[in-house]
Amino acid sequence: DWSSDVCSSDLAGHVANRITIVNMKKPTHEEWLQWATENNISRPLRAWAAMTPKAFKSYLDPDQTDNPYIFKPSSTAKSFVSPRSLAKASPIVEKRHKYSENALTVALAGTVGESAAKSIATFISVEHNMIKFTDVLADPMNVKVPEDIATQVMMILEAVDTLSSHDDLNKYMQFVKRMKSSEIQSIFFTMMFRNKPKIARYNTEINNWATENIGIM
């Protein structure tokens, strides 16, 4: 919310009277993910956002007192999660190989806050567990499905970034259906429709999944 997070209430009356103040709702994690994918935001950050919708809440929302990620007027913390700070963190994550583990966490903490930094670091740490995209397409029914949820999310985001044909999407959907979590499958479905609508809209495997899982949409 612009009026709260930018502290417009601190403006002097004669200054506030010269501008128009409009309350603007924050994007949901799904809305931010669509923008982030279109703007090449780092994949580990997008994976973290996909699994951490509470980071996109406002302190004005109910029951956010214990939310460790967001801005709160009562907190002295200068770094917190916002759509802007997540985007600002992207170059840091992209250059993660130049940082020590501690330096990376410290840099992220100074950008999105300590709680988010430690949580994002978890997603970065599982990157080496990802199955190659080409290996999935080569044998979608038998290639190993990683058990770790963070790894699965990283993989489906890579697929959303990479898929460009119905044939490859059909193969990857066979792999996605082997994932035990319907939530992960739903993220893949949603991201494909938002970011690759031309191949998702008329894809048989995607449409069959939507019909079978209409209850969780």
Predicted regions and their residues:
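Short, small-residue-biased leader/transition segments that mark boundaries at the very start
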Residues: D1-S8
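A short helix-turn-beta junction within AAA+ P-loop NTPase domains corresponding to the substrate/partner-engaging
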Residues: S9-E30
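Generic structural signal for alpha-helix starts
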Residues: A12, E38, S42-R46, G113, ...
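Compact nucleic-acid interaction/catalytic patches
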Residues: L33
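Conserved AAA+ ATPase small/helical "lid" subdomain
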Residues: A36-A109
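Generic structural signal for hydrophobic core residues of well-folded globular domains
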Residues: A89-R96, I124, V160, M192
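Accessory nucleic acid-recognition modules appended to NTPase machines
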Residues: E101-D168
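Terminal-proximal interaction/regulatory segments of ATP-powered molecular machines
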Residues: V145-M217
